């Protein structure tokens, strides 16, 4: 379970261009299911996901994971929690050009020191699961948008995380590919993982796999409802 208590995030604090991205957000996120954070650009949904996923620290407030306070952990401990707990799918995919599909999937696992052969086997199995087995040796720049998105999903799973965070996962996809990705995320939730999605895509809000919809506006939660 993840809990946020009066969490705020301020960028450029004390400067003329100060920006309050989140304003005293309190939230309890239970394990399992698919939770979608919706809102227009600048509403704070992506910032909220970066805090939940321990990619950034709040300016004020507390964040706990299964009762453990994360918001004041030293960076090396926070990094360890992030690597073992969370898998990330970024809006721009963040695949490294010049590397193969297989090499991209393996990247997040290198710091954990797994044996190389074991890592290759795990990455190949994930690519097979996502219908990309035959693309393993291809350079990522040759992939279609849908293939790149599935590669990003496979990479997010390489460390077997319990929580998947997807920022605008359908942003660059047509309706058919969007439904495919949402189905894959739903399958992950069915495997006892927790899935958090930020989006302003109606296809995401209406997906049958979504259990909870949280709406943000100007850095505040303005609606929170089960689906």
Where are these regions (language model features)?
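Conserved ABC transporter NBD signature motif
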Residues: 61-69
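Catalytic Walker B motif of ABC-type/P-loop ATPase nucleotide-binding domains
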Residues: 164-167
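Conserved ABC ATPase signature
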Residues: 139-143, 147-149
């Amino acid at each position: 379970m993840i809990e946020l208590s009066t969490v705020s995030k301020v960028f450029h604090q004390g400067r003329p261009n100060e920006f309050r991205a989140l304003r005293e957000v309190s939230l309890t996120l239970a394990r399992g299911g698919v939770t979608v954070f919706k809102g227009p650009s600048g509403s704070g949904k992506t910032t909220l996901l970066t805090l939940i996923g321990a990619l950034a620290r709040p300016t004020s407030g507390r964040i706990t994971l299964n009762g453990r306070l994360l918001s004041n952990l030293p960076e090396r401990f926070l990094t360890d929690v992030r690597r073992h707990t969370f898998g990330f799918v970024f809006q721009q995919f963040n695949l490294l050009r010049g590397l193969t599909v297989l090499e991209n999937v393996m990247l997040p696992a290198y710091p954990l020191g797994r044996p190389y052969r074991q890592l290759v086997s795990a990455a190949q199995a994930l690519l097979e699961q996502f219908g990309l087995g035959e693309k393993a040796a291809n350079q990522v720049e040759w992939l279609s948008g849908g293939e790149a998105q599935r590669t990003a999903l496979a990479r997010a799973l390489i460390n077997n995380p319990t929580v998947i965070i997807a920022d605008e996962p359908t942003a660059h996809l047509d309706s058919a590919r969007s439904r495919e990705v949402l189905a894959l995320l739903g399958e992950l939730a069915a495997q006892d993982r927790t899935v958090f999605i930020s989006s302003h895509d109606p296809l995401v809000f209406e997906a049958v796999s979504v259990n909870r919809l949280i709406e943000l506006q100007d850095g505040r939660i303005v609606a929170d409802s089960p689906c």
